[in-house]
Curated annotation (Swiss-Prot):
Pfam families named among the record's database cross-references: DUF576
Subcellular location, record wording: Cell membrane
Lipidation (S-diacylglycerol cysteine): C23
Record key words, sorted: Cell membrane, Lipoprotein, Membrane, Palmitate, Signal
Name of the featured protein: Uncharacterized lipoprotein SAR0439
Family: Belongs to the staphylococcal tandem lipoprotein family.
Length: 257
């Protein structure tokens, strides 16, 4: 199970590297259940979904605080990955991260293919540089594998087809809080009839019929800040020592450092 812990740490580091940010405009959270507050904290971002044309983000502003320099329009980062335990002792993780700079109206990132190992062996990782123009992913590195090349060029982020505006229908979640970080987690059982679940099943090799769990994680202030992150995961895993999930985040942070 060690490689699953390493994978979780790797994802957290990836998120901190590419999106140390709070998502969406800050919203005054009224006193109420933490479940409600967490959903409200996510709502401003998730209400933007689906973002069919990612270039629309050039004209959208997220939560701003004192970390932004005067005149900095900020940068959106969108990230989606699919992780699956295909072989005993191994975990395959594949996805894309894209940074959209609102100052220059340019979008650059990379597609990644990573394999984690339980025996302590260092992960195998390959990154392929990409950019986006006219809402189309353009591969900058040479890829000889035609299947992989097509997968990269036709890649769609979960946020481009997801519809999570009806968060209110998910209730009685399992909430956990660490006030020292602070961090907040809530989990909801999803139905296989959910359109988001159907979309994921049509796009990824999800072998189980098990209904997934929607996991919402926040590091940082619930009201929003440019320090911390928000992560959404739809987990299809059948067993504790296996992994089958899709992770998504959309964040807004200063573009100028």
């Amino acid at each position: 199970m060690g490689y699953l812990k390493r994978f979780a740490l790797y994802i957290s580091v990836m998120i901190l590297m590419f999106a140390i940010a709070g998502c969406g405009k800050g919203n005054e959270t009224k006193e109420g259940s933490k479940e409600t507050q967490i959903k409200k904290s996510f709502a401003k971002t998730l209400d933007m979904y689906p973002i069919k044309n990612l270039e629309d983000l050039y004209d959208k502003e997220g939560y701003r605080d004192g970390e932004f320099e005067k005149g900095d329009k900020g940068m959106w980062t969108i990230y989606t990955d699919f992780a699956k335990s295909n072989k005993p002792g191994e975990l395959d993780d594949e996805g894309m991260v894209l940074n959209l700079d609102r100052n220059t109206r340019t979008a650059k990132g990379h597609y990644f293919v990573t394999t984690f190992y339980r025996n302590g062996k260092l992960p195998d990782e390959k990154n392929y540089k990409i950019e986006m123009k006219n809402n189309k992913i353009i591969l900058l590195d040479e890829v000889k594998d035609d299947k992989l090349k097509q997968k990269i060029e036709n890649f769609k982020f979960f946020g481009q087809y997801a519809n999570l505006k009806e968060l209110k229908k998910y209730n009685n979640g399992d909430v956990s809080i660490n006030e020292n970080v602070p961090s907040y987690d809530v989990e909801f059982k999803m139905s296989n009839k959910d359109e988001n679940v159907k979309q994921l099943r049509s796009r990824y090799n999800i072998s189980t019929e098990k209904s997934p769990i929607l996991k919402m994680h926040i590091d940082g202030d619930l009201k929003g800040s440019s320090v911390g992150y928000r992560k959404l995961e739809i987990d299809f895993s059948k067993r504790e020592n296996s992994k089958l999930s899709v992770i998504e985040f959309l964040s807004y942070k200063p573009a100028k450092k």
